[in-house]
Amino acid sequence: MASSKSLMNLLTFSFGSAIGFFLCYLLFSMILEEQVEIQPHILHNDPHGQHSEDTDNNQLQGQMNFNADSGQHRDENRNIADGLYEKVKILCWVMTGPQNLEKKARHVKATWAQRCNKILFMSSEENKDFPTVGLETKEGRDQLYWKTIKAFQYVYDHYFDDADWFMKADDDTYVILDNLRWLLSKYSPEQPIYFGRRFKPYVKQGYMSGGAGYVLSKEALKRFVTAFKTNKCSHSSSIEDLALGKCMEIINVQAGDSRDTSGRETFHPFVPEHLLIRGYLPKTFWYWNYNYYPAVEGPGCCSDLAVSFHYVDSMTMYHLEYLVYHLRPYGYSYRYDPDSAKGLEEQNKNEAQEDNPKLKQKTSEN
């Protein structure tokens, strides 16, 4: 009798434990699944991938007005930024499509696009309400270079005299125009040059990542558009950034160095956490082999005067807007001297020595 009672207790305990373990497993599975679903950013395995996809979890419903609290910044000294706005005129055009106007482009329009001297949204078809410029192309990744060519042709035909520099960005790119103006202020728009995140495969002088955005000087734009009229360049590839880079090399447009005076990158093909957190990008990831200059992970990855970030979903667009233009630490004066070029000159000298052993030996002898 006692043994039967013990057996019953054992079975009851075992059954209860099994139920408990099952419920715990179910609960943790639901929690982990939810965490995976709300993860806003994933690794993008294509170096030439152009757009992120907003899921239902990270797609913002409605548009935010970040200018509503502008009174809080009325005492802020913007003299330098305002002066550069007049001195370095930038036309921005954003690559988008009919399906992305509400999901992506409207949030670009509500944030950084307001700081362009002129903003255009380029789509396959016209939308007078948004508005967009209709390029009369098809949608799809295989159409990206063709859309880029037609967009720059449209800008050249209609707005060439309205700006000095011409910036192309995606509808999931966040751009800090004030920092871009500082970078460009060191150069003449009559110089054949363009800037962006410089990649190295396939093009001798390198080419600029499409997702991080790139900016052409007035002379570079003129040469690019003319090259298609004279058949120096052609629509020979669907890979937008690489094809444009090859064309730029053919027409002798220089791939500029967009790093700051400390040698840190300003254009970024990913969101900040991918670059700031060591180990986020595995060493087998394509990114490490594509950078023209040695890539850095951790805080040294990114300039204090960063220009752009890519794969920015609609919610992160406003996160960046707040962090860049609204958040201020109390009691600090700006600590960085962007006009001191000694740091980058020294770094370029060291890189030249590493590439040229004879120069390195001569320097050590001196």
From Swiss-Prot:
Domain of life the protein comes from: Eukaryota
Gene Ontology molecular functions: glycoprotein-N-acetylgalactosamine 3-beta-galactosyltransferase activity; metal ion binding; nucleotide binding
Biological processes, Gene Ontology terms: angiogenesis; kidney development; protein glycosylation
GO CC terms of this entry: membrane
Topological relation to the membrane, as annotated: Single-pass type II membrane protein
Compartments (UniProt record): Membrane
Lumenal side: 32-366
EC number(s) stated in the UniProt entry for this protein: 2.4.1.122
Catalytic activity: an N-acetyl-alpha-D-galactosaminyl derivative + UDP-alpha-D-galactose = a beta-D-galactosyl-(1->3)-N-acetyl-alpha-D-galactosaminyl derivative + UDP + H(+)
Cytoplasmic compartment segments: 1-10
Residues where UDP binds: 95, 139-141, 147, 170, 310-311
Cofactor: Mn(2+)
Ranges that cross the membrane: 11-31
Paired cysteines (S-S): 92-116, 233-247, 301-302
Subunit structure as annotated in this protein's UniProt entry: Homodimer; disulfide-linked.
Family under the similarity heading: Belongs to the glycosyltransferase 31 family. Beta3-Gal-T subfamily.
Biological role stated in the UniProt entry: Glycosyltransferase that generates the core 1 O-glycan Gal-beta1-3GalNAc-alpha1-Ser/Thr (T antigen), which is a precursor for many extended O-glycans in glycoproteins.
Protein's name according to its UniProt entry: Glycoprotein-N-acetylgalactosamine 3-beta-galactosyltransferase 1
Gene this protein is translated from: C1GALT1
